[in-house]
Amino acid sequence: MERTYLMIKPDGVQRGLVGEIIARFEKRGFKIVGLKMIRIGRELAEKHYGEHKGKPFFEPLVGYITSSPVVAMVIEGKNAVGAAREMMGATDPLKAAPGTIRGTYGIDIGRNVIHGSDSPASAQREIALFFSADELMEYGLELDRWVYE
């Protein structure tokens, strides 16, 4: 099974969308193996968004992500990275398909409710950045045999 990292951003937390967003992934058959609410400090934000350092939107992005708590989570399932990205929709909510998370709840490209890893390699890096090994659970679900066999 593949794992991916998801983060409900400050606008999603402030607007009370956490439960709805988590429910979408559970209803799709993904297993939540890590979940916590955190306040991201500047150092962690800079590591997370390091690829954007030097770009004009870097400082506003770091300021935004550190402005309020976020919900960090790791989900597990078949094609977790690709399926989660499909469920989230395009980064720009104006271009996101109706019914996707960003298409439904996103306001603009800066307030698009959720972040998800864009590749299996990014997922590994982001999971390690936000979770220690003992914060990730290994468990089976009765549902697994219906979804994955």
From Swiss-Prot:
The keyword Metal-binding applies. Its EC number is 2.7.4.6. Its main location: cytoplasm. Its cofactor is Mg(2+). GO terms for molecular function: ATP binding; metal ion binding; nucleoside diphosphate kinase activity. Keywords: ATP-binding, Cytoplasm, Kinase, Magnesium, Metal-binding, Nucleotide metabolism, Nucleotide-binding, Phosphoprotein, Transferase. GO terms for biological process: CTP biosynthetic process; GTP biosynthetic process; UTP biosynthetic process. It is an enzyme of class 2 (transferase). Gene3D superfamilies: Nucleoside diphosphate kinase-like domain (3.30.70.141). One of its GO terms (cellular component) is cytoplasm. It holds the Pfam family NDK. The active site is at residue 115. It catalyses: a 2'-deoxyribonucleoside 5'-diphosphate + ATP = a 2'-deoxyribonucleoside 5'-triphosphate + ADP; a ribonucleoside 5'-diphosphate + ATP = a ribonucleoside 5'-triphosphate + ADP. It comes from the Bacteria. ATP binds at residues 9, 57, 85, 91, 102, 112. Belongs to the NDK family. Homotetramer. Major role in the synthesis of nucleoside triphosphates other than ATP. The ATP gamma phosphate is transferred to the NDP beta phosphate via a ping-pong mechanism, using a phosphorylated active-site intermediate. This is Nucleoside diphosphate kinase.
